[in-house]
UniProtKB/Swiss-Prot annotation:
It holds the Pfam family Ribosomal_S20p. Residues 1-25 are annotated as: Disordered. Residues 8-20 have a biased composition (Basic residues). InterPro entries: Ribosomal_bS20 (IPR002583), Ribosomal_bS20_sf (IPR036510). Belongs to the bacterial ribosomal protein bS20 family. Binds directly to 16S ribosomal RNA. Keywords: Ribonucleoprotein, Ribosomal protein, RNA-binding, rRNA-binding. GO terms for molecular function: small ribosomal subunit rRNA binding; structural constituent of ribosome. GO terms for biological process: translation. Gene3D superfamilies: Ribosomal protein S20. The lineage of its organism: Bacteria, Pseudomonadati, Myxococcota, Myxococcia, Myxococcales. GO terms for cellular component: cytosol; small ribosomal subunit. It comes from Myxococcus xanthus (strain DK1622). This is Small ribosomal subunit protein bS20.
Length: 91
């Protein structure tokens, strides 16, 4: 347990940050999962909307510092690549 006032404060801060990070990570996970599911569907508009919302969630998480900038960029890139592949398969 924390022995000093500053350590207690840092612990409180870390708990707040952890709660915030868990929420943001959950939102990102949900957005990416729905985008992956949309890739399997035949609806092109649904697919592009899902990819856009996932990319937005990933970018926001990177801006907030929850995800590293390059991690978010890599995930967005992979989603876009999968979307292109799915679009070609449908055509």
């Amino acid at each position: 347990m924390a022995n000093t006032k500053s350590a207690e404060k840092r612990h409180r801060q870390s708990l707040k940050r952890r709660a915030r990070n868990v929420t943001v990570r959950g939102e990102v996970k949900t957005a990416v999962k729905s985008a992956r599911e949309a890739l399997g569907s035949k609806d092109g508009a649904k697919m592009t909307d899902a990819i856009k919302s996932a990319a937005k969630a990933l970018s926001k998480a990177a801006t907030k510092g929850v995800l590293h900038k390059r991690t978010a960029s890599r995930r967005i890139s992979r989603l876009a690549k999968a979307a292109t592949k799915a679009a070609r398969a449908q055509a």
